[in-house]
Amino acid sequence: MSWTPQQSAALLNVRKWFSQKDKPFFTLGGWAGTGKSTIANHIAETLGVPTLFMAYTGKAAYVLKRKGVQDVSTVHKAIYTPKGKATLAIQALQAELLVCKEDKRKKEINHQLDNLSRPSFALRNDSPLSGCGLVILDEYSMISQQIGEDLLSFGCPILALGDPGQLPPPFGTSFFTGPPDVMLTDVRRQAKDNPIIHLATLAREGKNIPLGEYGESRVVRRGGNSDFVKEADQLLVGLNKSRDAGNRNLRRMIGFEGDFPNAGEKLVCLKNNAEVGFFNGQTWKTLENATVLDDCLGLSLEDEEGLKAGALAQTAPFLGQPLDRFTDFDTFDYGYALTVHKSQGSQWDKVALLDEWYGNHRDQWLYTGITRAAEKLTIIRNA
């Protein structure tokens, strides 16, 4: 392996930190194409200790596996485990169900049972971190204060990778604050030939991105061929009104009808509920048609890693109404279109990006959206 002087210095600093262990984590920052992942892989292969790679979402973990990483997990799966259920409450509802004669009440009881039976979470006693010599954590900006503290509680040294060119995390302040311990700024010569890295570099530097073809990626005008959107794994947008319109249109293209989710639909979580394993920005699939109750929806869900859960969710997002920020119900919406802010920490093979954000952090917004694509990108602009 041939290293640039900057990469060689980064490797030296990582090894020095690991040997001295004067602090529990080391942050390695770098723009897209500067070799963060290459350095991390080399460290994992040559340190001679068991190493676990971790990503914030299942989609990002999948991309790491595609790149040849063998031992990879999501953060939540690695450190949290389902814990005991509300047994007494479940037994009381089951007893009521046996004698209940009113169909509406039976439906309510069944969804209360689903909700109580869903897993709640605690730190894993059998976490893979327990026997681990090193954790390599991708996208460290997405780690909240609580998750960061939980990670450190296992006592395993953490090499945290991140990209300061991206948007700040959507939830506020990350656990990993301040400048990275080492920052890579030199985009590798071979990476410059990658169309997505090239487009990302133009965006980060605030340069114009002309219309045209970039390998298998492209920049097109809005209002043309809609196949680019239909073929994408994920549509990313800048505005909530575009997200609403995109979700409506894509549901219609697929063949779903009605306001509320049918079986097999794609949802995104809009509010953290760590106690039961729901995290803001996490995507889920519906296993059954939603059940409409008096003041909420009953949802049967499965996440990217096959974990099943029941939810009692507020109806407002599915009806285009303002969210109730203070409700005890969980909050989901359709996930066919996501804002770039909500997409942070994840990645898809094929992305369609509606370039429409001209608010704060314009260059970071575009850079973040572009780097959500692993293989193929279509940027759709208004003019």
Model-derived regions: residue spans:
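Hydrophobic positions on the alpha1 helix immediately C-terminal to the Walker A/P-loop
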Residues: 39, 43
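Dynamic helix-loop-helix/coil hinge segments at AAA+ ATPase domain boundaries and subdomain interfaces
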Residues: 1-9
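C-terminal accessory regions
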Residues: 301-383
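A short helix->loop->beta-strand "cap" motif at the edges of active sites that frequently abuts
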Residues: 132-133, 154-158, 373-375
